[in-house]
């Protein structure tokens, strides 16, 4: 792991003082904020999981090479994406096939990003903007492996949120009140565990009849065991 990050890879700068070397500013990275993945800090690099260390180093090196091409007015290196793609597919194949002894909250997202990258195919990329975005996704996949310790989340927050809404089809980030929603469900299940399945059945019944809003009950009847629905009754 240390050997993968302790020196410069193909001209890719490595900051050693805890500061990123111009990521996304046009110094070190490509113009117009492209190829922010061409730089990294030593502290961040060594904090990545060992399983992604070599791949992350290649992403950084390829990004630096592409950033140099961009600054010189050349197109993306023809072998840049095919090289990264082959290495990623091999690594992601092992990751997807390995059992997960302990569930990690980032695993579903990591698998979604991985499937998206695999589906892109190995054909060379024609534009720097597209290659830069793919390098960012590859780096994001790596950093999901240390999601709670990553020191570079700002590199992904804006770009990856936009990508998720338009490319992965996952939809928007869960609303801020999602925790309150689940807390209410847990409280209901804890208070009346034997009735909880019937509450769920009632909700399914209402949705099947076209109701999209919650059924509002008078406060005096909220503990009743029967809910009247358009002239019918659902007995709990």
Curated annotation (Swiss-Prot):
Entry's Gene Ontology cellular component terms: host cell nuclear matrix; viral tegument
Highest taxon, organism lineage: Viruses
Sequence segments annotated as region (Disordered): 1-32
Family in the record: Belongs to the herpesviridae US10 family.
Designated name of the protein: Virion protein US10 homolog
Protein location: Virion tegument; Host nucleus matrix
Record keywords, A-Z: Host nucleus, Late protein, Metal-binding, Virion, Virion tegument, Zinc, Zinc-finger
Native species: Equine herpesvirus 1 (strain Ab4p)
Main location: virion
Pfam families named among the record's database cross-references: Gene66
Sequence ranges of Gly residues compositional bias: 21-31
Induction, as annotated: Expressed late in the infection cycle.
């Amino acid at each position: 792991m240390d050997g993968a990050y302790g020196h410069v890879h193909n001209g890719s700068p490595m900051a050693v003082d805890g500061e990123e070397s111009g990521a996304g500013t046009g110094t070190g990275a490509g113009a117009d904020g492209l190829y922010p993945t061409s730089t990294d800090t030593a502290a961040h690099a060594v904090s990545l999981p060992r399983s992604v260390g070599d791949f992350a180093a290649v992403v950084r090196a390829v990004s630096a090479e592409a950033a140099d091409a961009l600054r010189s007015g050349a197109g993306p290196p023809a072998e840049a994406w095919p090289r990264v793609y082959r290495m990623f597919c091999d690594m992601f194949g092992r990751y997807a096939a390995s059992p997960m002894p302990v569930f990690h909250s980032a695993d579903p997202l990591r698998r979604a990003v991985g499937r998206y990258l695999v589906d892109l195919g190995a054909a060379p990329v024609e534009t720097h903007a597209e290659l830069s975005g793919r390098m960012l996704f590859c780096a994001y996949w790596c950093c999901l492996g240390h999601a709670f310790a990553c020191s570079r989340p700002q590199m992904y927050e804006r770009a990856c949120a936009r990508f998720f809404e338009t490319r992965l089809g996952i939809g928007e980030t869960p609303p801020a009140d999602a925790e309150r929603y689940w807390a209410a469900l847990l409280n209901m299940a804890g208070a009346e565990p034997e009735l909880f399945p019937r509450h769920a059945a009632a909700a399914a019944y209402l949705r099947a009849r076209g109701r999209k809003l919650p059924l509002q009950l008078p406060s005096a009847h909220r503990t009743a065991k029967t809910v009247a629905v358009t002239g019918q009754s659902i007995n709990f």
